[in-house]
UniProtKB/Swiss-Prot annotation:
This is Homeobox protein Hox-B2. It is found in: Nucleus. PANTHER family: HOMEOTIC PROTEIN PROBOSCIPEDIA, PROTEIN ZERKNUELLT 1-RELATED. The gene is hoxb2. It comes from Salmo salar. Residues 1-60 bind DNA.
Length: 60
């Protein structure tokens, strides 16, 4: 029973990308803040950043 894939809204993606551009690694307080702001779980934010860094690595 795998976890459901999260469908991020455009707004959420925009904010996450903006944050990523500014900072590739999040400290926990910031993660909590972003999760609350975007109505996501901390886990979702953490995983998004993890995946985004991998994608970033592949692109360079």
């Amino acid at each position: 029973p795998g976890r459901l894939r999260t469908a991020y809204t455009n707004t959420q993606l925009l904010e996450l990308e903006k944050e990523f551009h500014f900072n590739k690694y999040l400290c926990r307080p910031r993660r909590v803040e972003i999760a609350a702001l975007l109505d996501l779980t901390e886990r979702q934010v953490k995983l998004w950043f993890q995946n985004r860094r991998m994608k970033h690595k592949r692109q360079t």
